[in-house]
């Protein structure tokens, strides 16, 4: 399929039959599924499900990330038609990828929300697929990890973030995006000894055994060494990547609820992710994209690129196992 075929393609999210292959249609028209994948709730034959969780009722400061999944999907339409740069293969040709749509939930019943998230991801995993989740605020990580831990055991987590999200909070009924890693460790769904946080640049009294490569260290060491250390920490176990967009400096991702200066440049994040090729990635997310503060759309574009890199990593793992 060539670029000129765009004149004949529209609404592939509803009309395309094949879960594999490039989708060539005008970026400014049609239904904006992620990468113009097919929207479906049928996970038969799906290798990887992209899904949105438009929730921001756990934020501490500025809301708006409930609009993140929609913005990331729209920004994904700007991805090049060519294979993703720097990977040497095209995951869209090798993986059956579907857009599983957004998770349904009653916004007025927040007490039910964590369980709904776990059930949602559990359904994807039970079908034999992996998940890439578009947030939404970062609280969703804890209930996502519950589903993954049921299948794989306590999860090594690679967390890109400006904040540790380890505020002590033993009230498991509270919903707060600054506490979800604390709760993930305390409930045994995250493995702190094999987890690492990259890009941190806010204080934390107790990292609960999680290793940290803070933002100054990233700038000093360079992406290749950061990736080497991350790989050494997580080893060969099935692992999960959670990418809070505020890991990036506000110059590259201003549209987020809790921006912190001194963060990663987009090129650093891209290089680290690509240098992680070969880790045993079984799922991931990109969270905290907040379109109301994203006046140029740059943050949504960054979020779409991160999601694409997660897809590339997921596919690379399966190529190595084939």
Predicted features along the sequence, with ranges:
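Conserved alpha-helical scaffold segments that buttress catalytic/binding sites
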Residues: 2-322
